[in-house]
Amino acid sequence: PERDGDYLVDGVINLREGAQVTVVAVMTDADRTRWLVGAPDQDRYLLCEPVRGHGLSGEPPRHILHADQDYALERRGQSSAAGVGMHGRPALPRVATYVYRAGPDQTLWLERWGDQVLMGAATSVSAHDVHFLPGS
């Protein structure tokens, strides 16, 4: 996904898996939507571009072919979910998350809300490259 932009946060989902909290910020810059995924104590974020029309529903497979790349499941988890704002996710209390990799900087982030699957093609960005304005 394109990294540069002045994004406005439309909504936020806090995902809690045990003691680990992951934040998904749904952001827009003009007509571009991106998801910024990460934990406050990590030094890297995933910057995801939503993938439409992927055809997945229910439990995702162990391998996903996307943009001529074979992505293998690296990690999955179950989290409680609490959202605010216009995040575009179903109003469900739990979500399953999946991380797939095809290379060092070729990542897919998936969220499964019941049978609905959301997919983002992601690149890793340094937390030092992400800046939040005061009051955000």
Language model: regions and residue ranges:
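Mixed-charge, low-complexity intrinsically disordered regions
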Residues: P1-S136
